[in-house]
Amino acid sequence: MQVLVRDNNVDQALRALKKKMQREGIFREMKMRGHYEKPSEKRAREKAEAVRRARKLARKRAQREGLLPMTPRPVAAGGAAGAARPPR
């Protein structure tokens, strides 16, 4: 995995790398491989994750159909939307 360092800004490159790794699921993979997981525990975890996904999907579908109220999105601490990050 590669990240470009622009203008010797290592902090920005590290943030970009961390975001890429998060998106790719590398941190989750490292956590899962950190210890042995019994097959029965793996099945139970995967089943619980599937139930969680199904509930989330059903909740989103109900909100779209108007059966549940839409949850308001949290407002950023910076105030106006997009003010925290300069345009590219």
Swiss-Prot record:
Cysteines paired by S-S bonds: none
GO cellular component: ribonucleoprotein complex; ribosome
PROSITE patterns: RIBOSOMAL_S21 (PS01181)
Keywords: Ribonucleoprotein, Ribosomal protein
Molecular functions (GO terms): structural constituent of ribosome
UniProt biased composition (Low complexity): 73-88
Region (Disordered) location: 58-88
Biological processes per GO annotation: translation
Family: Belongs to the bacterial ribosomal protein bS21 family.
Protein name as annotated: Small ribosomal subunit protein bS21
